């Protein structure tokens, strides 16, 4: 029986009713799984949640390439490439390139005559990302992988080929417009953050590198979660937002199953991500919580305003002082050092001209006025970006499922 004649009944809860002329076929009838290794000289490819299959060096990627490139799999244009561990996040796509990908990916050669661009949009649409999550198995979110047997049965939604091409043309054009708008707004956010940084540098930068060492103004704390009776929230530290509850910035569960060894921080404590301190990853805890045992938890002496101190430590001059003191393998430049960390002892050797409490309060007030204005603009811009991204995802879903006739709106 020709696989081109194989169709399946529509009983798929995550897809809308079929449009006239549209069909469903199982993935196994359209693709053949192939594992073609031992091609170390081919270019490296990777699958990104936001970009699909692209050259690995075209995007920032924290995953290290294995020394033995012979274990990587060769794929060709039109092949379906799936990151089995991250399919539920959207790390799936039809490759437009020839190259090699991780040996842990699932690679399928095409055995069909459908439009590759349409299939790429389809496989990366919200309904299909939802389907990958349904077909993934594991201990918990963040540690799952797609079930191979279930994946082979994935129903593929197929309009006539001429409609596929029209959908691909429409989405190429419309998403490019949205992406341009999003990029403009992202550049605006970057510019606003630079203005924010410049305001802090202007107000406090000159106080760095003179007067007394920081050790006279800070106390390091090391209280562990298993030493306190409270059930405290997990906190995270970022370069952009400082210290926040982890559940406010990511839906992923904690990587560590046992958090009993995590450090306790109290509201107003200074928390430093020691691996990213030289990039400004520090801030004041907005509430009691627990943080990674690798973080440093510090408390300012009573005569030092914690908000003033955190602002001073995020100035460009102070961050540069920290960068000079990191210890790790490699260079601190652009975060290239492997396992870079700053020791609290080295941190406390940095000099800081701490004024009297009244002057601290005045400087904090001036900075806060500027920060509040800029932060409002950043929030408004980021909300606009989020709405544009939601619009983009909804447009893709509507097009690939036939909820809009792209030939009428083209």
Region spans (language model):
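Acidic, low-complexity, intrinsically disordered peripheral segments
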Residues: 241, 399-410
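Extracellular/lumenal glycan-associated surfaces
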Residues: 172-174, 390-403
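A short beta-sheet element
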Residues: 73, 77, 81-128, 147, ...
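Non-catalytic DNA-recognition/assembly elements of restriction-modification systems
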Residues: 2-39, 153, 157, 161-165, ...
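A short glycine-rich beta-alpha junction/loop motif
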Residues: 6-13, 85, 99-106, 139-165, ...
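Sequence-specific dsDNA recognition surfaces
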Residues: 8-12, 25-77, 215-227, 231-267, ...
